[in-house]
Amino acid sequence: MKQAMTPEEIKEKKPYLDWSLTEAEYDYIRTQLLGRLPNYTETGLFSAMWSEHCSYKKSKPVLRLFPNKNERVLQGPGEGAGVVDIDDGQAVVFKAESHNHPTTVEPYQGAATGVGGILRDIFSMGARPIASLDSLHFGELDNSTTRMKVTNTVRGIGDYGNCMGIPTIAGETTFDPCYQGNILCNAMSVGLMDQKDIQQGRAAGIGNAVMYVGAKTGRDGIHGATFASADFNDENMTQRSAVQVGNPFMEKLLLEACLDLIRNHPDWLVGIQDMGAAGIVSSSAEMASEGQSGMELNLDLVPQREPGMSAYEIMLSESQERMLLCVKKGHEEDVKKIFDFYDLEAVTIGRITAGHDYVLFHDGEEVCHIPVSSLTDDVLEEESLEKKPARIELAEQQPAWIPDIDNVAEVLTALLAQSTIADKSSLYQQYDSQVRTNTVAGPGSDAGVLRIRGTHKGLAMTTDGNGRFVYLSPEVGGQIALVEAAANIIASGAEPLAITDCLNYGDPTDPEIFWELHQSVQGMADACREFNTPVISGNVSLYNENNGQAIHPTPMVGMVGLIKNIDRVIPSFVQHPGDKVYLVGQTRDDYAGSELQKMMTGDISGIVESFDLHHVHQYMQRLLTTMENGLVSSAHDLSEGGLGVALAETVFKTDLGLKIDLADQHTARLFSETPGRFIVTVAPEKATEFEQVLGKDAHLIGEVTNSHWLMVKLANGELNENVAKLQETWEEAIPCQLKSKD
């Protein structure tokens, strides 16, 4: 087929500039890697594979700061997902991915295909997905466009996950004006497997087959990788052709077929990989690179649902529900029979070749002949300029903001109605959290918890991130993101194992934004080392801007923890009247970036103060010990809204109350957001032993009561509020806002 442009026309007209390939990169490819002008198809492949979304060419130097190994890690970054040993020959597999740009443009399909893509990463490793999580960040709900995007994003996540029969058991949803023009949709999936079934995305063995399985290839999602590597503007906000369209029913069949092959016929399979960003070119080139092999593909054999597709379109399509397999020669028909059983296509489209060349044929002609390494290993890493933002320099010279609170009841009630704090059940009730009946704790708890059938073990999982803290103080904010995730895991009675992440930032060519990325990753990395929670997978999503307005830097931490005895799962809500109430951790005047500051001033400002990361980790480990020894009745970590909001949340959906004595604390401290704190309830007969373990880090502040009242005594006031009244405010806030009219 005739190419859309000749190599000479490409050199002259430079269409690659619209595909996120720079002129310097193009010149390097033609002079240093190929020694000739690349043709149209080849230029398109380089544009996709050298995009930030696929290559991490800007962020890779920063990503090297992360630890990625410890005694439990079986597979770290580089494969479809990370794998962690959970004893007894079993492993947990997990990863998070962003689908921010597609979801901003087309919320329903963008969110749905984000779920589908991350599920394929999990089962491509040989694991069965057992849970989904999300991290969603929207503009304010007083905007009709935001309300539409919230509704459709949540519906997309729910529809895809529910059709797959995989519970969505945890997540977070926040609202801030910075996400108005560029929402964040981060999806996480967790899978369970036997360690013997771990797969790799590799293609090796001369003569072995390259097999395409799953849905047909269409024109949806072409250049989705480069779309995700550019800022939004008025022109590309309507670029719906870069958004994929999902079919969860086909994905369910694909999952079962792949696991059938992996578990029952592992000797037929060399490697397997999802066709995600950049479609066939990404999966095939990465597998060939991993196997140090050459590869030859005949694109005429690729199943296509639209006529007249060019080689360029076939290779860069991001049609969903597709996988690429490397199958041992002679077993092609055996593999085909498995996929036939599930009514799925399985076609041999190429072979592994000697050498290291990547060769494509289309319409009987050779349309690509380049080294495999030129697509995967020879990408030019970019040195980015960094500059500390002037706003931070200025804030460091200003006095800290301390709120003046006259009516503590009014402030607490107003905070409970803030969108980020308010009850999200009207959103997550659209997700099936109980399917497969392994869910012990679902949405609304500090972490989602699943039992592992046939064992006494359980898995706890969470997603956490706070862009406000990172915006004000990137390094400390990065630490807080990790500490908040660990706090949610430990509050459930689980030992943190490892993390995945989504690094959501603006344009990295802006020196201030790259400085934010660097500093926050440094903070996260320091916290990962302290907590021994390596980064085993994840992704980077840059260029989250709209017409030059960047989001707050928002690293999302997805963490999984191991519960040794599922009977010792710790609930988030108070359990027994008469139990002692403890505040674990120190409270300071930490209001910069808090929900209280945003509510009272309409903005955020100041510096997020550093804290003793090692000390926080030490007492969190001691707290976990008390849980494992059966000393704790309930636990809830403190986050948005501080102690006041957390106290209310522990008695919501119960018929109990709290009597709290904070006579040594001024009123504002009730809403401080000092990290690493917990509300813990303990039976009176276990209180002495609990205090002996926690020492000065546990502060007795009250007791659980039979009355449905929240009573708090403060140095300069009192709070006496009916819990049912507070709960009504908390529950009705988001439904009322979603129904409002502009």
Curated annotation (Swiss-Prot):
Pathway: Purine metabolism; IMP biosynthesis via de novo pathway; 5-amino-1-(5-phospho-D-ribosyl)imidazole from N(2)-formyl-N(1)-(5-phospho-D-ribosyl)glycinamide: step 1/2. It comes from Limosilactobacillus reuteri (strain DSM 20016). It is found in: Cytoplasm. Its EC number is 6.3.5.3. Monomer. Part of the FGAM synthase complex composed of 1 PurL, 1 PurQ and 2 PurS subunits. Substrate binds at S98, H99, N100, H101, R120, Q244, E318, S319, Q320, S541. Belongs to the FGAMS family. Coiled coil: none annotated. This is Phosphoribosylformylglycinamidine synthase subunit PurL. Its main location: cytoplasm. ATP binds at Y56, K95, D501, G538. GO terms for cellular component: cytoplasm. It holds the Pfam family FGAR-AT_linker. The active site is at H53, H99. GO terms for biological process: 'de novo' IMP biosynthetic process. Mg(2+) 2 binds at D121, D274. InterPro entries: PRibForGlyAmidine_synth_PurL, PurL_linker, PurM-like_C_dom, PurM-like_C_sf, PurM-like_N, PurM-like_N_sf. Part of the phosphoribosylformylglycinamidine synthase complex involved in the purines biosynthetic pathway. Catalyzes the ATP-dependent conversion of formylglycinamide ribonucleotide (FGAR) and glutamine to yield formylglycinamidine ribonucleotide (FGAM) and glutamate. The FGAM synthase complex is composed of three subunits. PurQ produces an ammonia molecule by converting glutamine to glutamate. PurL transfers the ammonia molecule to FGAR to form FGAM in an ATP-dependent manner. The lineage of its organism: Bacteria, Bacillati, Bacillota, Bacilli, Lactobacillales. The keyword Lyase does not apply. It catalyses: N(2)-formyl-N(1)-(5-phospho-beta-D-ribosyl)glycinamide + L-glutamine + ATP + H2O = 2-formamido-N(1)-(5-O-phospho-beta-D-ribosyl)acetamidine + L-glutamate + ADP + phosphate + H(+). GO terms for molecular function: ATP binding; magnesium ion binding; phosphoribosylformylglycinamidine synthase activity. Keywords: ATP-binding, Cytoplasm, Ligase, Magnesium, Metal-binding, Nucleotide-binding, Purine biosynthesis. Mg(2+) 1 binds at E97, N539. The keyword Transcription regulation does not apply.
